[in-house]
Each structure stands twice: as C-alpha cells, then as structure tokens.
Amino acid sequence: MVSNFFHVIQVFEKSATLISKTEHIGFVIYSWRKSTTHLGSRRKFAISIYLSEVSLQKYDCPFSGTSFVVFSLFLICAMAGDVVYADIKTVRTSPLELAFPLQRSVSFNFSTVHKSCPAKDWKVHKGKCYWIAETKKSWNKSQNDCAINNSYLMVIQDITAMVRFNI
C-alpha cells in the first residue's frame, strides 16, 4: 500500500500543472476484490469527473481546492484497485493551442510502472526505465545525478541481472 501511495504521489507531482488546466478526468479501476455475484472475478469501475472551466480559473495554485479533490478521488480509486486508467482532457488557452485538440491518456499499473523513458539512451525493461552511465562515479555523486533526474540507483545483486541489462 505504501508503494502504491508513493507512485500516486509521483504521478500527481508530475501532472500538477496539467491538472490545473483540466476540464475532464475519467478513471477506470480494475479491482480484484470478490463481488457477490461473480466470486473471484475482476470488477471494472468507471468514474468520470467534469470540472467546469470557471471553477478552475478561481485557483492559480495547482495544489488548490479543485486539484486536491481530484487528487483525493484519484488516490482513493488507485488504492482500491489494481490498475488505473486515466483519461485527461485539458483546456487550451493560447490560439496556437486551440488549433490542436489535446486528449491525453495515462495507463498506470502499480506492479510495474508503464511510462515512456525520459531520453533515447534509457533502456526499458519490464515496464521500467533504466539508464546505465558510461563513466564511473562515487555512490554519492551517482545518487545526486539520480535525484536530479527524479530516479533511483539500481543495485545489481547477481550476474544474471548484469546479463539482462547488457552490462
């Protein structure tokens, strides 16, 4: 549960500016909890939230009342289910933005984080992104580099893992 919360916080922090311009968010949650009619089957819940543009314009801070309500609903849904699918439609403000409609979809699975990697030199393995440095640095300097890139150091414990990552 703590791991799920950490991933949800990361998603929220990265999308705070997007949420402040959001007019519609839809969530789909797949739950492994047993239902009364189909024991053991997956149940699908859909939650759709429409936020009027006027109510969002009242708040300048992305962590304001509206965003907090949206985040709280997302957090509750994420904790209750296994997979969260979010469909986010944002409001365009500049004339150039209005020419191109924006529809964003985010797929999130708490067992493995599915996302596109930050740059081409990162490797994807089992839904997670890895970057292997070309130069050797101390542990502390490497940790600082990871913190700057919002990532963590990978610890390789056996030769099999090294082969998988072509090290």
Curated annotation (Swiss-Prot):
Extracellular domain ranges by topology: 89-167
Kindly give the PANTHER family that the UniProt entry links to this protein.
C-TYPE LECTIN DOMAIN-CONTAINING PROTEIN-RELATED, KILLER CELL LECTIN-LIKE RECEPTOR SUBFAMILY F MEMBER 2
Write out the GO cellular component annotations: plasma membrane
Instruction: Write the gene name.
Output: CLECL1P
> Taxonomy-wise, where does this protein's organism fall, top ranks first?
Eukaryota, Metazoa, Chordata, Craniata, Vertebrata
Name the UniProt record assigns to this protein:
Putative C-type lectin-like domain family 1
Its membrane topology is listed as: Single-pass type II membrane protein
Q: Which GO terms describe its biological process?
A: B cell adhesion; positive regulation of interleukin-4 production; positive regulation of T cell proliferation
What residues does the C-type lectin domain cover?
A: 116-167
Question: TM spans, by residue?
Answer: 68-88
Q: Which UniProt keywords apply?
A: Cell membrane, Glycoprotein, Lectin, Membrane, Signal-anchor, Transmembrane, Transmembrane helix
Q: Which residues are glycosylated?
A: N109, N140, N149
**Any idea what job this protein has?**
May function in mediating immune cell-cell interactions. May act as a T-cell costimulatory molecule, enhancing anti-CD3-induced proliferation. May play a role in the interaction of dendritic cells with T-cells and the cells of the adaptive immune response.
How is expression of this protein distributed across tissues? Answer: Expressed in spleen, lymph node, and tonsil. Lower expression in peripheral blood, bone marrow, and colon. No expression detected in thymus. Highly expressed in dendritic and B-cells.
Query: Where is this gene product found?
Result: Cell membrane
Q: Recorded GO terms, molecular function?
A: carbohydrate binding
Q: Which residues lie on this side of the membrane: Cytoplasmic?
A: 1-67
